[in-house]
């Protein structure tokens, strides 16, 4: 009986007045979605780094583009936005092709070095995984930012996002280098365990 009395006398939680302004900022749903998006991007960076290690020239780039398209599709689903594969390819080409020194031409050139016996494959293995991972990371971050600002794939301007892409590309290089180092360390551990 005392428990019933205490429960009935407990103050009700204060409700916000109907005319009070809502607090701007992230909601629990948007914070959760942001975490899912960030983890999703990192998973696709890992896949892009792995795909770029394939020793077949140009197949590696095709695989990375396919991975990036799948990432864009999944981010579009996460944010409830429409997806178009042809527009996705166009945005990838516009963003990745526009970064001086690390554009699509650079990736193709690095991929083609795998044709050179011995040293060519090593050159490709050193630089392409970082380029592939950084590009994937930057593309993912561009789409997340654009979607969070209310945009969709149909109104994404690569020119307007180029500076942000370059900034995220630099962050992506660091992330991809870490992923590559972990994969190499795991490979060494596997070899050591086999002997």
Swiss-Prot record:
Start and end residues of each stretch annotated as Disordered: 1-31
Comment field (misc): This bacteria makes up to 60 cubo-octahedral magnetosomes of about 45 nm in diameter which contain membrane-bound crystals of magnetite (Fe(3)O(4)).
UniProt KW keywords: Biomineralization, Magnetosome, Membrane, Transmembrane, Transmembrane helix
Transcription recorded as keyword: no
Subcellular location, record wording: Magnetosome membrane
Membrane topology according to the record: Multi-pass membrane protein
InterPro entries: DUF697
Name of the protein: Magnetosome membrane protein 22
Biased composition range(s): Low complexity: 1-28
Species of provenance: Magnetospirillum gryphiswaldense (strain DSM 6361 / JCM 21280 / NBRC 15271 / MSR-1)
